Curated annotation (Swiss-Prot):
The gene is rplP. Belongs to the universal ribosomal protein uL16 family. GO terms for molecular function: rRNA binding; structural constituent of ribosome; tRNA binding. GO terms for cellular component: cytosolic large ribosomal subunit. It comes from Staphylococcus aureus (strain NCTC 8325 / PS 47). This is Large ribosomal subunit protein uL16.
Length: 144
């Protein structure tokens, strides 16, 4: 699973989940990508589950790029504990995904294989997504 090697502060405030993604909106490394159309937190376990689903379908052919990283810790207090008495312990790590963000990129396989692999990965994620292709001049074309 993905998590930072070290952080300056162990616990953080919850991140903002409004607006569109500022960066990472174009397919840059691969030929095809999976683009988010809604906002959500994605945990490191969900990212790993989506990666496994893609690589198994592609039978280890081609290359996969994970374009998001769970930098932000989220905390949780134990069950049946009263309010107060400090912030809870770190439960896991999340990546905040906003609309327009490319989550995964794939190269080295046909479009049909890439489309199905990214569809399987999208079922593991809590965001709505769409399949995008890379253009020659650096951008991407939006295809549903």
């Amino acid at each position: 699973m993905l998590l930072p090697k070290r952080v300056k502060y162990r616990r953080q405030h919850r991140p903002k989940t409004t607006g569109r993604s500022k960066g990472g909106n174009y397919v840059t490394f691969g030929e095809f990508g999976l683009q988010a159309t809604t906002t959500s937190w994605i945990t490191s376990r969900q990212i790993e589950s989506a990666r496994i689903a893609m690589t198994r379908y592609m039978k280890r052919g081609g290359k996969v790029w994970i374009k998001i990283f769970p930098h932000t810790p989220y905390t949780k207090k134990p069950l049946e504990v009263r309010m107060g008495a400090g912030k809870g312990a770190v439960e896991g790590w999340i990546a905040v995904v906003k609309p327009g963000r490319i989550l995964f990129e794939v190269a080295g396989v046909s479009e049909e294989v890439a489309r199905e692999a990214l569809r399987l990965a999208s079922h593991k994620l809590p965001v709505k997504t769409k399949f995008v292709k890379r253009e020659e001049l650096g951008g991407e074309t939006n295809e549903s």
